Amino acid sequence: MKRLLFLIISLLAAVTAFSQNFPYQNPQLSPDERAKDLLGRLSTEQKISLMNYQSPAIPEFGIRPYNWWNEALHGSARNGLATVFPQAIGMAASWNDVLLQEVFDVASTEQRIKFSTAREGGDAGQYRGLTVWTPNINIFRDPRWGRGQETYGEDPYLMTVMGRAVVNGLQGDTTQQYDKLHACLKHFAIHSGPEYERHIFNVEEV
């Protein structure tokens, strides 16, 4: 009887400890406060494990598995039935940033639905998450580059206007508490086209 009582008390203590509301779980705190609290609780090994695109679960802190690999260049990518919009280079030819923002508002709504459905089914695979590697804002100045169709062309001004519209459409109203999706503009470090000397120059000549 004593052993049974001890077991019950231990289980209750474990459940109470797990259900404890840590500051990082409090939506009333700012994102910075919540992130700082969570990072202070994670070990170095746990932090490293979260740095890959395929982040494992950390059950003791209620962190579910998450896959950061997702795209929405012209609609929800590789994720079953979804609206397929024209490629970016085609939409750039419209010069209509208002329409482009509406397009990506629709795309983000569809992706949110797909995320919720996947999460309910325990699916944390690629192309299921709320982070998208979109838009591609490389300046397309050489037709030999095989990813030019992902961009909004060769004009920096048009790229700026259209890129902003895409981000606003994906993330939603800036007055709301949370973004609909998180947009990741690419490519800053790599995949910048066939110009091999792009990242090498003499700063003394600038």
What are these regions (language model features)?
Residues 1-21:
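Bacterial Sec-dependent N-terminal signal peptides
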Residues 20-206:
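Glycoside hydrolase catalytic-domain context in secreted enzymes
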